[in-house]
Amino acid sequence: MRKKGLLLGFFVLCLVAIAWFVYHLWPTDTTQAKRALVQVQHQRYYQLSDTKGNKLFFSSLNSDSLLEGAAWNERDVRPSKWITDGFWVNKTWLYPSCNGEIVTAVSDSSHVMANKLEGILLVSNQLNKSKRQLNGLKHQQNELRYYLRVHGVQDMGYNIVAGYANDIHLQCDTLNKVIALLQLMKKSQKVRLLRKDIFTISYKNAEGKVEKTHCNVIREDANHKILILKTKDSRFPSNAYAMTIVPWNIDDMNESMAVTTRFRQPCTIEFAHPGSMIFVSTYMHKGRFSGIKLSDGYYNSRQIDKLIHLEEKN
């Protein structure tokens, strides 16, 4: 009798386990996918600094390895901004295991180039560029001064030209300060280029209101295509849904669709935002999560899973 009871208990446990895994690995519907979706805002700016405490801040790094949008106060810098999609994700398919982790696409890869730049060489190139810009502005300034001398306030367009001349004067003033700081940095011979990234996600809470929270980057794949973000308090919203990556390959991407913040309903991958979830059609109007859209292609679910299980960044 005791043996029969043990066998019955074991049988019930097996049924419960099978039911759980079937439920957990069941394809996703649009409502669940929308609950997993977040919008990611990425802001980035750069800081040049030397050992004597001199600092300059810049909005972006261009393709010529030169910094744009200079400011000498951090509060005045205007960060570059990008918007992508992202989604909550479980660390394992065995059980709910999202500790505030989000997968998203890399919005800008200029940091790869920035990591290879030598600080002192960047200062030298930046100094030459700033001097050329200043010379060009001074030429405009001289022409505008001449115009304002030979024309009066009563002349048509005088006020517009005067306003433009004032803007040029302010730009010259800014460049003179930037050049002075760059010259000081060049003398120190030890300059660092720091990158500052700010990630903020937006999602709807249980009341349907938009909430925002800051995140840290904990992983980035070697090809600089996708990131794993984590909320600073490791919080996963109670009303959200975390995507589960199934433990088998999904190679057939035919009839795949994307779920994105851009549209209410699934759309073709081409029209979705980078960071959107990709699904392959299954049955009963459901889909199997199969990958993430990038700015140039997509990553499949196994590539995402590989990154999820790497060690976190320090």
What are these regions (language model features)?
Residues L8-F21:
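Hydrophobic membrane-insertion alpha-helices, especially the h-region
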Residues W20-Y23, W72-S80, I201-E211:
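Short, solvent-exposed secondary-structure boundary motifs
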Residues H24-L37:
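Ser/Thr/Pro/Gly-rich low-complexity linker/stalk segments immediately outside membranes or between
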Residues K34-A36, W82-T84, C98-G100, E211, ...:
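Envelope-exposed proteins and targeting segments
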Residues S109, N125, H139-G275, V280, ...:
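Serine endopeptidase catalytic core focused on the charge-relay Asp
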Residues Q303-K313:
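Short, low-complexity, Pro/Ser/Thr/Gly-rich segments in the mature regions of secreted, periplasmic
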